[in-house]
């Protein structure tokens, strides 16, 4: 940490005594250590000070230049600003020879040219706030009113560093000796001289105050601590550090200065300043030698002085090891008393005490589930989640009730399954940030209101083994400490976005891909499977690797024994877009379904379909993540929620494959945690086993039932009802243009002017129009429907790729597909 500290001279520029004969000159503020000796004459005057033609302005500029050079050459940081003009009508020094200097980095919220000393009332209020609120600086600043949060934080830092308890000194009197750092000087005159030397000396080593590097938004307040320490030196012996020199003698130099033999003059000033920053280091021998070297230039008896100081240096070197050993036992800033196992009191640093306070007492899992009155907010809740009860406009008690009750409702729905934070967020939009929702969720879990009896519930975080355990604290308000531990209790998990753009746990999406086999690969694989049947031993279970993920599984039908969990109604607009999208590609296409779910009526309405881009590898295809996110946002802008997905089986049955079942089951589980529903729809436009020109559509969900061989969960098919609302014609035209532009140049595009099967006279385009006509027959006037179909036909004829442009290769592949 020492490398991060900087010595800031807060007195050197104004604290020097005036040169003889130049009391009024501004040059008198500079001491020998600021200028090289070659620039001085024998009488101590600077050459440029003798020139009376230099104006005051130029003289001030020269002084500033020399001061800057000294700071740069000595590797010191320049002050924020320093006054060089001595005109009383313009500027005045903020520090004088009779007052110790003060430095303050002001907060932007409270600008001031100088720092304001803390009053007795402010200090008393600070201590009251500290006892009441602890280390919550915002609360204490609100109590003070006259101080900002940063100023309170800065004062607290100095307050804790200079706080030394009397009872600690009383209990350890036998540990004090003449070699300790905390010793008292026997001579009152010597101590008074040391305090005066602290103020009057211009030695930068004496006037250096070590300041820890802080962030840009923190105040550094060193205004009144130094004054208090020097003024209370003779009264509060526990508030400063001095070095005891038992046989110290006083001597007078030829210039009449009162000095002390030994390192007291040096160590006294440093000790008083080191108390300010909480340091207990003894002055080194190099610092004493440096001080003697500077006295040599002004003292005629330098030989005698050096001889005496060399003796002191030797003695100091001999005892330095002992002093450092004693320094290890010196009390640290803000000592906290603690008793060890033997009953002896021990001192621990404040950072350790603070960490142990945060660990707190281990919470016990609730013994029984807690029932909470939905209309009442208990006092414990206000203590644990105080942010909703502090008068904020965005966080009100009503909003807290809404969030809490919604979480409790979701727990009742999913009980006994674990209710995580992610699953409750979709139903709490515009109710605050995810962190405050998470804190309420964790609080309810800790008290046993939700997730009671679930293995995933975490009530205590693991404690490091090498931590020093604090003694058990029996506090009446221990129950209210939950609020400080809400977010730190549970181990953080990696968060990722699901295909719909929502944040979720990474484990929720493991193994989920939208992959489907092309028609050619499906036929080839089936032939291979017939030629090479797989033989399993009777005792062995079906290996997972032997399962064909593209095997189609017929759907079961709901019955009286197993009724539909809800009804499914599909709007004409969604049917039109799904048919348009599925008819133009020999490869599978994918999209999202948007709509709404009515919990009261148990009805799921599919109001819109949003086509998405798909990525194909020849054997399988999956939805483009970017396109999925855009589609989800588009549905949200229209006021719809994502309630399902659709894809096509171009030339085979609209039954789900094993991979479709796995994907649908995972998304059902994910959306059901938040109370939402999620369905899957499969469109088969060119199924060879279907003699009719209409597409086959399957709407399904995956049940909890498992197949007889235990390899997959059983899919169930809904009886879909069509809604009687007219589609938004312009929106359908817009989607049609996008589909045509997307697939007209695609290698997998279907030639719409070709006969779609041998025993039919309809082209693919005419077949598409027949499907659309059947959909519109229930919702629109026949004239409006025919006009719409005519415009769709014109769009394909004018913009879609023709058979000749496709090439012979694609024509052959099309024949193989449809014939």
UniProtKB/Swiss-Prot annotation:
Zn(2+) binds at residues 647, 649, 660. The modification Phosphoserine is found at residues 107, 215, 332. The keyword tRNA processing does not apply. Residues 113-164 form the SANT domain. It is an enzyme of class 3 (hydrolase). The modification Phosphothreonine is found at residue 233. Disulfide bonds: none annotated. Disruption phenotype: Deficient mice elicit hyper-inflammatory responses, are more susceptible to septic shock, more resistant to RNA virus replication but exhibit early death upon DNA viral infection. They also show an impaired B-cell development. In a similar way, NK-cell and dendritic cell development is impaired in deletion mutant. An enhanced systemic inflammation can be observed characterized by higher cytokine levels, as well as the hepatocellular enzyme alanine aminotransferase, a marker of liver damage. GO terms for biological process: chromatin remodeling; immune system process; pigmentation; positive regulation of transcription by RNA polymerase II; proteolysis; regulation of cell migration; regulation of hair follicle development; regulation of hemopoiesis. Its EC number is 3.4.19.-. GO terms for molecular function: DNA binding; histone binding; histone H2A deubiquitinase activity; metal ion binding; metal-dependent deubiquitinase activity; transcription coactivator activity. Component of a large chromatin remodeling complex, at least composed of MYSM1, PCAF, RBM10 and KIF11/TRIP5. Binds histones. PANTHER family: EUKARYOTIC TRANSLATION INITIATION FACTOR 3 -RELATED (PTHR10410). Belongs to the peptidase M67A family. MYSM1 subfamily. Metalloprotease with deubiquitinase activity that plays important regulator roles in hematopoietic stem cell function, blood cell production and immune response. Participates in the normal programming of B-cell responses to antigen after the maturation process. Within the cytoplasm, plays critical roles in the repression of innate immunity and autoimmunity. Removes 'Lys-63'-linked polyubiquitins from TRAF3 and TRAF6 complexes. Attenuates NOD2-mediated inflammation and tissue injury by promoting 'Lys-63'-linked deubiquitination of RIPK2 component. This is Deubiquitinase MYSM1. The lineage of its organism: Eukaryota, Metazoa, Chordata, Craniata, Vertebrata. The gene is Mysm1.
